[in-house]
Amino acid sequence: MKMDPRLAVRAWPLCGLLLAVLGCVCASGPRTLVLLDNLNVRDTHSLFFRSLKDRGFELTFKTADDPSLSLIKYGEFLYDNLIIFSPSVEDFGGNINVETISAFIDGGGSVLVAASSDIGDPLRELGSECGIEFDEEKTAVIDHHNYDVSDLGQHTLIVADTENLLKAPTIVGKSSLNPILFRGVGMVADPDNPLVLDILTGSSTSYSFFPDKPITQYPHAVGRNTLLIAGLQARNNARVIFSGSLDFFSDAFFNSAVQKATPGAQRYSQTGNYELAVALSRWVFKEEGVLRVGPVSHHRVGEMAPPNAYTVTDLVEYSIIIEQLSNGKWVPFDGDDIQLEFVRIDPFVRTFLKRKGGKYSVQFKLPDVYGVFQFKVDYNRLGYTHLYSSTQVSVRPLQHTQYERFIPSAYPYYASAFSMMAGLFIFSIVFLHMKEKEKSD
């Protein structure tokens, strides 16, 4: 059956259009939904959004109460990342709510949340789901010793020292930063949640309370328990960051000079907000600190292929390739604290892996115990995704032909056995050939 040439000519433009559409879809970066209180935030925080676009992110701006909002459709996530820059929202629009966002996190999505003193209930509930408790509405972090010279008198324009940052270059960046400018609501971490990260804390003189009221009760957060920026990496490697300040990401704070109001304090021409905001966004959106397992191999020393079963006390070699995502490309990971465990129920062997070229390997002797074992690498470090690799193998006992014919430690027993045999042989000869003398009359 032949195709009409006219149909073929018409089909070529359609094929070209389809290929162009597929090319655009494949070339698009991570899909990111940005929820705003109003679209003016897009202009007041343009530097931050521009940094995301320059890194290839596809941003979709919508107001938080837009009735067409949707994160999930037909069981599939419509976006890879979610940015909530709408602290005062009381009800999300469309089918987005706290439960939907929690499901998005459970599905591995990344979320960046910025609050303020005008925080609404939805963000407070979302924080509680992630082990973060925000202070009451209209409260602010106050520090009478570490406030900026441009503060209006309530001491809520905080100058946070970089010494209060989490010691994790993967999260906060590797370069030294100028002091951080902060104005917003304080947070407290759930002490029972080990996954919460105290990224930026207040100083020992900071506290969270109503700035226009006298203190009549103990503040919600005091001293270094006051969190300015907090993070979370879930067990499924989903990442969330909570900032108590929406102004932290603003152009005004990025370009502002900073100087503490204390006499003799150093003046900086620019804050460290921009560098920190970029570093945090790179981490939360999984541009940094992402690891993956490459090919894994194991075999007896001197061989190349793994056997069907190992034998106890075999000398084996284990190798694994671990890669890290860097600037959109997978490169070999450089770490000196990666351990291998040889586990049955409990580890029988635990040893460090040594890097050789682009892979990590180690040689060790199997224990004199047979059963079903696992080569296990369980690498969990601050700022990195959880890396786990498990390979199951069987270890059998020695065959009867593989045992030593004589065991040196048993030589005394061998000697006693052979001496007993020789003595019995001599005794038998003597006994059989001995003849009693006949008695004479």
From Swiss-Prot:
Transmembrane segments: 413-432
Keywords per UniProt: Endoplasmic reticulum, Membrane, Signal, Transmembrane, Transmembrane helix
GO biological process: protein glycosylation; protein N-linked glycosylation; protein N-linked glycosylation via asparagine
Protein location: Endoplasmic reticulum membrane
Record topology, Cytoplasmic segments: 433-441
Broad class of the protein's primary localization: endoplasmic reticulum
A cellular component annotation (GO) from this entry: oligosaccharyltransferase complex
Keyword Signal: yes
Matching Pfam families: OST48_MD, OST48_N
Topology class, membrane: Single-pass type I membrane protein
Signal peptide (residue range): 1-28
Pathway(s): Protein modification; protein glycosylation
Disulfide bonds: none
Superkingdom of origin organism: Eukaryota
InterPro entries membership: DDOST_48_kDa_subunit (IPR005013), OST48_MD (IPR055459), OST48_N (IPR055457)
Chain ranges on the Lumenal side, renumbered to this chain: 29-412
Family note: Belongs to the DDOST 48 kDa subunit family.
Function description: Subunit of the oligosaccharyl transferase (OST) complex that catalyzes the initial transfer of a defined glycan (Glc(3)Man(9)GlcNAc(2) in eukaryotes) from the lipid carrier dolichol-pyrophosphate to an asparagine residue within an Asn-X-Ser/Thr consensus motif in nascent polypeptide chains, the first step in protein N-glycosylation. N-glycosylation occurs cotranslationally and the complex associates with the Sec61 complex at the channel-forming translocon complex that mediates protein translocation across the endoplasmic reticulum (ER). All subunits are required for a maximal enzyme activity.
Subunit structure: Component of the oligosaccharyltransferase (OST) complex. OST exists in two different complex forms which contain common core subunits RPN1, RPN2, OST48, OST4, DAD1 and TMEM258, either STT3A or STT3B as catalytic subunits, and form-specific accessory subunits. STT3A complex assembly occurs through the formation of 3 subcomplexes. Subcomplex 1 contains RPN1 and TMEM258, subcomplex 2 contains the STT3A-specific subunits STT3A, DC2/OSTC, and KCP2 as well as the core subunit OST4, and subcomplex 3 contains RPN2, DAD1, and OST48.
Protein known as: Dolichyl-diphosphooligosaccharide--protein glycosyltransferase 48 kDa subunit
Lineage: Eukaryota, Metazoa, Chordata, Craniata, Vertebrata
